[in-house]
């Protein structure tokens, strides 16, 4: 039997989906601007 795919890890979560990592790429900045446009409560993880 295979293990569950979600193995929570705070550091990995932020490194992958955090604000700094989003801002470091053009597509990430696009994600943030789209979420700002939608008035999302949380922009990033």
Swiss-Prot record:
GO terms for molecular function: structural constituent of ribosome. Residues 1-20 have a biased composition (Basic residues). GO terms for cellular component: ribonucleoprotein complex; ribosome. GO terms for biological process: translation. Gene3D superfamilies: 1.10.287.3980. Keywords: Ribonucleoprotein, Ribosomal protein. The keyword Ribosomal protein applies. NCBIfam families: rpmH_bact. Belongs to the bacterial ribosomal protein bL34 family. This is Large ribosomal subunit protein bL34. It comes from Tropheryma whipplei (strain Twist).
